[in-house]
Amino acid sequence: MTKLSKRQLDILRFIKAEVKSKGYPPSVREIGEAVGLASSSTVHGHLARLETKGLIRRDPTKPRAIEILDEEVDIPQSQVVNVPVIGKVTAGSPITAVENIEEYFPLPDRMVPPDEHVFMLEIMGDSMIDAGILDKDYVIVKQQNTANNGEIVVAMTEDDEATVKRFYKEDTHIRLQPENPTMEPIILQNVSILGKVIGVFRTVH
């Protein structure tokens, strides 16, 4: 495989993902936002190097004309983290938690905090839609047993049911707040925090 820098891999990976999910490549601005580059000229420089290496082809007269030339180029395994997918958690009415690993899902290492235990859960329901978490999405969760007010968590209720909600510790109770104005919060005396949601993965059908 052609040797690429981590930034070039990130850019190539993002372009491939956008083409696969949307059917067309991202703009230079979108690439910059995705990989943390504020300067469009820096993005252009990386694209030029990818083009020189024969991995992409660009049409300078069009803003989104980026074609992947080598579809076999992929992320080296050393830059992939296999994250366990653990059952399903509701984002509507709680369902009984299933804590078994169903499969492992490869994620780019930049999406996974170093030295942290991370897992993924499939969402069922639409109570978190205003937070950008939709039915059938996968949430990426950093395993931890505490949370700050306002954080989105995976919480285990007193009935050993798991749910994804925004966490608030109030004077006499815990409030698990949905991000959907049509739904009521869950009020409990005690909950166990399984982890904090740090990302969302979505496939476009």
Curated annotation (Swiss-Prot):
It comes from Bacillus subtilis (strain 168). Following treatment with mitomycin C protein levels begin to decrease after a 5-min lag and do not return to their original levels for at least 90 minutes. It holds the Pfam family LexA_DNA_bind. This is LexA repressor. Residues 28-48 bind DNA. Disruption phenotype: 100-fold decrease in homologous recombination efficiency. Represses dinA, dinB, dinC, recA genes and itself by binding to the 14 bp palindromic sequence 5'-CGAACNNNNGTTCG-3'; some genes have a tandem consensus sequence and their binding is cooperative. In the presence of single-stranded DNA, RecA interacts with LexA causing an autocatalytic cleavage which disrupts the DNA-binding part of LexA, leading to derepression of the SOS regulon and eventually DNA repair; autocleavage is maximal at pH 11 in the absence of RecA and ssDNA. The gene is lexA. GO terms for cellular component: protein-DNA complex. HAMAP family: LexA (MF_00015). InterPro entries: ArsR-like_HTH, LexA, LexA-like, LexA/Signal_pep-like_sf, LexA_DNA-bd_dom, LexA_repressor, Peptidase_S24_LexA, Peptidase_S24_S26A/B/C. The lineage of its organism: Bacteria, Bacillati, Bacillota, Bacilli, Bacillales. Induction: By mitomycin, requires an intact dinR gene. An SOS-independent induction of dinR occurs during competence, does not require an intact dinR gene. GO terms for biological process: DNA repair; DNA replication; negative regulation of DNA-templated transcription; proteolysis; SOS response.
